[in-house]
Design a protein with these regions (language model features):
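Topology signature of small-to-medium multi-pass alpha-helical membrane proteins
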Residues: 1-143
C-alpha cells in the first residue's frame, strides 16, 4: 500500500467515534420516543438514569424537542465523521464540548454526581480529536 492509500485510510479512533455517535443517535431517538409516549414499553430505559427522567419531566415537551435535536446532530456528526468531512469533525468537537460542560455543571451542582465519570472520557476523546494527525485526516480526507 502506498503512502497515498495510508493518508486516506479511516483511522480506528474515527471509526470508534462514528460508533459512539451512532449509539448517541439511537439513545437520543429512543429517549425522544419514550418522552413522547410516557408509560410505553420503553419506560424501563429510565431505570438506567432516573435523574434524567425527572429532569426531562420538569422541562416538559421541550425535552422531546431537545432529544430530537440531539438525535439529528448525532446523525449528521456520524455521517460527517464517517465521510471524513471537516464539518463532521467540528460537529463532533462542539457536541463533545457541550457534553463536557453539561457534565461539569451536573457534578458541581450535585444534580448528577455520576457525571464525573464522563469528564475524563470526554477529555480523552477531545484530546484525540485535537491531535495533529486526527485533524490532518479531516483536512485532507478523500473518503
Amino acid at each position: 500500500m502506498g503512502e497515498e492509500g495510508r493518508s486516506n485510510a479511516r483511522p480506528v479512533g474515527v471509526i470508534a467515534l462514528v460508533l459512539l455517535f451512532a449509539i448517541g443517535t439511537c439513545a437520543s431517538f429512543i429517549s425522544a420516543v419514550s418522552l413522547t409516549f410516557p408509560g410505553s414499553f420503553l419506560e424501563p430505559i429510565w431505570n438506567l438514569n432516573p435523574n434524567a427522567r425527572t429532569g426531562f419531566t420538569r422541562i416538559g415537551s421541550a425535552a422531546i424537542v431537545l432529544m430530537i435535536a440531539v438525535c439529528i446532530a448525532c446523525i449528521f456528526t456520524t455521517i460527517g465523521l464517517w465521510l471524513g468531512r471537516r464539518w463532521g469533525y467540528w460537529l463532533a468537537v462542539v457536541m463533545l464540548v457541550v457534553n463536557l460542560c453539561g457534565d461539569v455543571v451536573n457534578v458541581i451542582s450535585g444534580i448528577e454526581p455520576r457525571a464525573i465519570i464522563g469528564i475524563p472520557i470526554v477529555g480523552v476523546i477531545l484530546a484525540y480529536l485535537l491531535r495533529k494527525r486526527t485533524r490532518y485526516h479531516f483536512n485532507n480526507s478523500a473518503i
